């Protein structure tokens, strides 16, 4: 099976119209709120179109005609329509917000679910700061697009059309003269949107970089302080901040050019009416009420037209955010369930690497023709220099990655032909970098089995030599461990991670330097617990300690991407003893790195 590199976070961009349509499609489940909002919008616009006609009647029939009744009734109707318009505006805004917040809720859930499903290869290339910005800031801009921004855009369009028709029906020549500015306004708005959107996206990507820099700085705060690099980090952050500042200035420059131009064009309508309309009134070709109605229509038109530039810029910004959100949602994970993949049933634990080669992101190989077979219940120790491929071997077993060539068989079945979740449910893992979540010790231990009972959790902690130190905390198993477990020592975090693996009760166990950061006494406790845990389970251990190598049923020595030597336990000798006899590389590692451990123990 060939390997394809995953799509990076920044990839080809969808077309603008497609992005807009796709954003709006998220409103479909909430169509009652959307329909209600837009019906109220139409009602609101109808009221806006009626008000100038009522004012015309008050001026021509009431004031000019001397009919006080028309004035009184006209004022009452205007007051009623104003109150009704306020109610419509309130309800429309409320329903729009419900729908748009629901869209944001769905998008955040979709992004989070997608990130859970994407392969390690995607997360290896993506930057955390970028993903956080897209899941929060960009989703909020899409929310604004599907809510008030698009509603206001529709309102402007409906008002322009409605006012244009009303003005044309009143006086054709004056209306045509006034409305000549509309095509120019539309052109400027479209030009402005097309120019502003890529600039807005560039600014957002600079915000990604700034967020990533800040996130990395906060995550490595202890290292920064330990190496006295505060000023250097301040300088790096300032460089990113300057780039963001420059990108925002360029975008705002375009915005500053477009908005005044639109306001200038919109104000020209009032000038035309006063010049030409005044002459028509003097020539008795237009009533004073009609002129007042015209100026009222134009004033109604000017406000939304002036907002058109801001609306277009907001829509352009939101569409750029939509592109970035959909880049995540459209990303394809390299490791997926193949068509026809079936859940993995109970397994014995026989595992075979069959001429497996692997390369990260399709680049140079890190594993080359790895071939070995492990029987159920055996313990396999992997030994080799940094970069020899130990971590890559164990990463292929739970399908964190798929081989570039060859295949991995579990009980004779290609692991790519079973569902990923069912495969991983049979595997317990203790990674080198222990990850604990910002919650209680109990919930961290039960992470792999959320429904585990109290006795099971305590038993797992006891087997991992964690129970005693947990009880030393005032809140015991309810102790909050803080972000990434910062309130615990390295050894304590490792033992909780081991308890988590024990509670899962896997058939296959993977240990990545699981006891590398504990003292001798704690190591002895953990080694005894792991020996009990590994009984009857197929286990893979990246070995750094001689005791692990002596207990292993098989020892694989990796060098330059290949298996340089393999030792197996027999009735006559251990895998360790065999390798000392047949492998010069293993003997060199033993005398340089492993034998000193033995000497320390016997001192």
Predicted regions and their residues:
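An intracellular "coupling" helix at the cytosolic face of ABC transporter transmembrane type-1 domains
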Residues: 32, 117-121, 137-146, 150, ...
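ABC-type nucleotide-binding domain
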Residues: 337-338, 344-603
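Helix-loop-helix
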Residues: 66-67, 166-180, 189, 250-323, ...
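Transmembrane helices of ABC transporter permease
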Residues: 29, 33-46, 151-202, 273-286, ...
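Short intracellular "coupling" helices and adjacent cytoplasmic loop segments at the cytosolic face
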Residues: 3-13, 65, 101, 109-133, ...
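Juxtamembrane helix-loop junctions of ABC transporter transmembrane domains
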Residues: 8-16, 39-40, 47-56, 60, ...
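Alpha-helical segments in transporter systems
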Residues: 21-24, 32-53, 57, 74, ...
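Membrane-integrated ABC transporters
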Residues: 1-51, 63-77, 92-100, 113, ...
